[in-house]
């Protein structure tokens, strides 16, 4: 069975967004070692899951980057745009973008159906409420939390209840980001 791997930027005090979803706290000064790690993580996946609320910005950003061949993110952007994306939504039937389809079915059944299909692992990016739902329903097999060197005091969280985790790896980078990889217990 394929694994569902959560990837999220997070603050040292556990927030994935400011009170209104602000992301101005994120560290974008990524060194080559961190970019290489992100590329390695991406190679193990062939499908992206997204919550509807973050999809528009995600698609718009990566589809713009692939028009900029000199961008340091160009190679990664090609992977993001080329990979099939499944967007979970209760309200929208169609979303514009390359390799995008919308899933309106019940979350647990739809995710388990995707996980049972042949292929590489599945990577999931936010938003906060979508990630929280996946965690609460015990659908996540691995968490890659990119801990940014900042505390914001309040904001959006992905953990709404006690969630025991086992640390698999923890690696620090020159940008101050520490990537903690966990498995749910």
What is each stretch, according to the model?
Residues 1-185:
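Enzymes that bind and transform nitrogen-containing heteroaromatic metabolites
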């Amino acid at each position: 069975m394929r694994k569902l791997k959560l990837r999220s930027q997070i603050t040292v005090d556990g927030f994935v967004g400011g009170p209104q979803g602000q992301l101005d706290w994120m560290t974008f000064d990524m060194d080559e070692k961190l970019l290489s790690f992100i590329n390695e993580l991406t190679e193990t996946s062939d499908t992206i899951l997204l919550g509807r609320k973050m999809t528009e910005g995600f698609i718009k950003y990566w589809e713009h980057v692939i028009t900029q061949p000199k961008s340091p993110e160009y190679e990664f952007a090609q992977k993001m745009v080329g990979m099939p994306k499944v967007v979970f939504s209760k309200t929208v039937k169609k979303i514009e973008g390359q390799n995008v389809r919308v899933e309106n079915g019940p979350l647990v059944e739809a995710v388990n159906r995707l996980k049972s299909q042949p292929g590489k692992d599945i990577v999931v990016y936010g938003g906060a409420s979508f990630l929280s739902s996946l965690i609460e329903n015990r659908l996540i097999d691995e968490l890659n939390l990119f801990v940014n060197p900042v505390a914001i005091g309040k904001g959006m969280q992905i953990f709404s209840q006690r969630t025991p985790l086992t640390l698999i790896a923890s690696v620090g980078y020159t940008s101050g980001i520490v990537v903690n990889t966990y498995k749910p217990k």
